[in-house]
């Protein structure tokens, strides 16, 4: 018995030793395929097994058995995979590149010390005389010196507490901007930049920033040789199209500049070429999404034998600064069907992934996850544009928004891989967690339908679905917090158009019937009797459905808020009565007197 016990101990010690010898690695630029494809690719080509693989943001993290295997894997840096060049890195146990944790912490500390949140100024002036940087040996060699600024900018781009509008780079012995060129990628919306007291002498060295700082208002270049050139002012105006102040001198009329660069119309959540198209498109979208979420087969009668459908995955991860964005999206259920032609290189695959006709379209419908849209409950989370298409006597609807994945597909296309193929790749496929890339989550989407009216119904000639990582809509305006103190509220209110009709919900669909027996419930008939003290602008009232008008009336009578504040309260609560009342009750002490009806 003791012999068996000793053998067990030896095996356990051997396993522990293997665990201790494992090397943690990461892989970048893999998102155009599934993690399973990546692990199999590595095992087939590099002959290295990756264990316990999982996704962390843009990285696949895993382990290899030894340092020798890790070094072997590093030789594959730059290898092409799914249209991108893979990048392998060695990591320590905390996920940071080996030997870099201390440096990252140090540079992060330097950034935070030099940032003023009051003025939103990042002061990177006179870095060569900074005692901390000198002691750390940052300037001990050209190599470390050249890497410092890009590393600082990479850290700054991920540091959410840094909201930078101005950067000072004075007194840094700069002869050109090659060492600081990444500033434009990190802070593209920079408004003020100081490069004074350097040694910049060529316009050509600034060309890399041409049209990069599109909001740069003020530039300070004093005490640089370049300022003595007779073309200096002309070149600076050419490089920076919105520059107003150069070396403390006004060089452009700011009001005229704003007129030139302002759009002829404000960004709108909903745009319809005419009222008729607006009604038709909202009817269609509401009805379509309802059946898409509940019974997709009933949609098939909307497609003709020539109709086309395709799905495309945009695997780009939103910037970390975007509120509520998904930094670890999973697209496993979509990848095998994705027709993103910027990622799919095979002409055969591009053709195969275009579904034509009802049977083919139905097949791909079944491979997509079950969903739930919230167009009616949360209309502010969606944006729609509709334009006519005279060539086919039809129109084009484009809808942006989000959906929740509520269930696995009826048919999982990523399980079509044959048994033999699985066995072939199994040897080097250790540690792959297939569920991580197939998790159900919230997704953003863009969907474009080309609609052709026909025989008192419609036909979908083309249907294109693009799936993206979830992020808030760009059309959404900043919420106005009712709970703000009166003195703060006064400074915010003038910026808000009084119940802007352009940011309201789409009109509620009226009764209509389309192919397949789909019908859209209409709104109650008869005019809503509003409280005499609830005076809504006609253009606003005309865009609200009876349910919303009833909610406004009910909130107005209950809270005694005036029309503007009642509308704001309803909109901020996503037209949910219970949420609105709770919000009102918790914010009563902060609501200004003028927000209430004056009797």
Curated annotation (Swiss-Prot):
Compartment annotation: Nucleus; Cytoplasm
Region (Disordered): 408-439
First and last residues of every LRR repeat: 163-184, 189-210
Domain spans labelled LRRCT: 224-262
Gene3D superfamilies listed in its UniProt record: 3.10.450.50, DNA helicase RuvA subunit, C-terminal domain (1.10.8.10), Ribonuclease Inhibitor (3.80.10.10)
SUPFAM superfamilies according to UniProt: L domain-like, NTF2-like, UBA-like
TAP-C domain boundaries: 546-599
Keyword match NADP: no
Top-level taxon: Eukaryota
Alphabetized UniProt keyword annotations: Acetylation, Cytoplasm, Leucine-rich repeat, mRNA transport, Nucleus, Repeat, Transport
SMART domains reported for this sequence: TAP_C
Domain spans labelled NTF2: 280-467
Sample GO molecular function, one term: porin activity
Record-listed N-acetylserine modification sites: 2
UniProt GO BP: mRNA export from nucleus; poly(A)+ mRNA export from nucleus; ribosomal large subunit export from nucleus; ribosomal small subunit export from nucleus; tRNA export from nucleus; tRNA processing; tRNA re-export from nucleus
Cellular component terms per the entry's GO annotation: cytoplasm; nuclear pore; nuclear RNA export factor complex; nucleus
CDD domains with a match to the protein in the record: UBA_TAP-C
Entry comment, domain topic: The leucine-rich repeats and the NTF2-domain are essential for the export of mRNA from the nucleus.
Function summary: Involved in the export of mRNA from the nucleus to the cytoplasm.
Assembly information from the UniProt record: Interacts with nucleoporin complex NUP84 and MTR2. Interacts with MIP6.
Entries under PANTHER family matching the protein: NUCLEAR RNA EXPORT FACTOR, NUCLEAR RNA EXPORT FACTOR 1
Miscellaneous comment as given in the Swiss-Prot or TrEMBL entry: Present with 2830 molecules/cell in log phase SD medium.
Name of the molecule in the record: mRNA export factor MEX67
Organism: Saccharomyces cerevisiae (strain ATCC 204508 / S288c) (Baker's yeast)
Taxon lineage: Eukaryota, Fungi, Dikarya, Ascomycota, Saccharomycotina
């Amino acid at each position: 018995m003791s012999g068996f016990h000793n053998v067990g101990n030896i095996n356990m010690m051997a396993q522990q030793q293997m665990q201790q010898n494992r090397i943690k690695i990461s892989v970048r630029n893999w998102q155009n395929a599934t993690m399973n494809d990546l692990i199999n690719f590595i095992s087939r080509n590099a002959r290295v097994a990756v264990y316990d693989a999982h996704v962390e943001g843009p990285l696949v993290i895993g382990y290899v058995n030894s340092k020798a295997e890790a070094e072997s894997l590093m030789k594959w840096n730059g290898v092409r995979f799914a249209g991108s060049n893979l990048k392998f890195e060695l990591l320590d146990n905390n996920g940071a590149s080996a030997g870099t944790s201390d440096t990252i912490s140090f540079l992060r500390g330097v950034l935070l010390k030099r940032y003023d949140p009051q003025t939103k100024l990042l002061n990177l002036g006179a870095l060569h005389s900074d005692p901390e940087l000198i002691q750390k040996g940052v300037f001990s060699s050209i190599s470390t010196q050249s890497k410092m600024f890009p590393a600082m900018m990479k850290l700054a781009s991920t540091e959410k507490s840094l909201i930078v509008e101005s950067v000072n780079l004075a007194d840094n012995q700069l002869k050109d901007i090659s060492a600081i060129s990444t500033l434009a990628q990190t802070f593209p919306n920079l408004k003020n930049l100081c490069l004074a007291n350097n040694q910049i002498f060529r316009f050509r060295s600034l060309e890399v920033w041409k049209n990069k700082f599109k909001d740069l208002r003020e530039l300070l270049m004093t005490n640089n040789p370049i300022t003595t050139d007779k073309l200096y002012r002309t070149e600076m105006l050419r490089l920076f199209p919105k520059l107003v102040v150069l070396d403390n001198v006004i060089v452009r009329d700011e009001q005229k500049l704003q007129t030139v660069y302002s759009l002829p119309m404000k960004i709108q959540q909903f745009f319809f070429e005419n009222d008729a198209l607006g009604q038709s498109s909202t009817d269609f979208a509401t009805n379509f999404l309802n059946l898409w979420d509940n019974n997709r087969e009933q949609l098939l009668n909307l497609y003709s034998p020539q109709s086309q459908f395709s799905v495309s995955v945009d695997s780009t991860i939103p910037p970390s600064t975007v509120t509520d964005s998904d930094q670890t999206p999973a697209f496993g259920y979509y990848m095998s069907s994705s027709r993103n032609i910027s990622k799919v290189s095979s002409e055969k695959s591009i053709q195969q992934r275009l579904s034509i006709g009802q049977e083919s379209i139905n097949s791909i419908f079944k491979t997509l996850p079950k969903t739930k849209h919230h167009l009616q409950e949360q209309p502010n989370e969606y944006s729609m544009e509709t334009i006519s298409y005279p060539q086919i006597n039809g129109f084009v609807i484009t809808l942006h928004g989000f959906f929740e994945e509520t269930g696995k597909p009826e048919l999982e296309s990523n399980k079509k891989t044959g048994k033999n193929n699985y066995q072939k790749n199994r040897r080097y496929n250790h540690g792959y967690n297939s569920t991580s890339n197939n998790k159900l989550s919230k997704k953003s989407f863009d969907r474009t339908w080309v609609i052709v009216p026909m025989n008192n119904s419609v036909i979908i000639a083309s249907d294109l679905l693009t799936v993206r990582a979830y992020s808030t809509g760009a059309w959404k305006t900043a919420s106005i917090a009712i709970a703000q103190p009166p003195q703060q509220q006064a400074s915010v209110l003038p910026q808000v158009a009084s119940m802007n009709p352009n940011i309201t919900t789409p009109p509620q669909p009226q009764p209509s019937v389309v192919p397949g027996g789909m019908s859209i419930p209409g709104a109650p008939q008869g005019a809503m009797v509003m409280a005499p003290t609830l005076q809504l602008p006609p253009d606003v009232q005309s865009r609200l459905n009876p349910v919303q008008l009833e909610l406004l009336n009910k909130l107005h009578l209950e809270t005694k808020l005036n029309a503007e504040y009642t509308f704001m309260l309803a909109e901020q609560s996503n037209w949910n009565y219970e949420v609105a009342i709770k919000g009102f009750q918790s914010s009563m002490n902060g609501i200004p007197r003028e927000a209430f009806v004056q009797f």
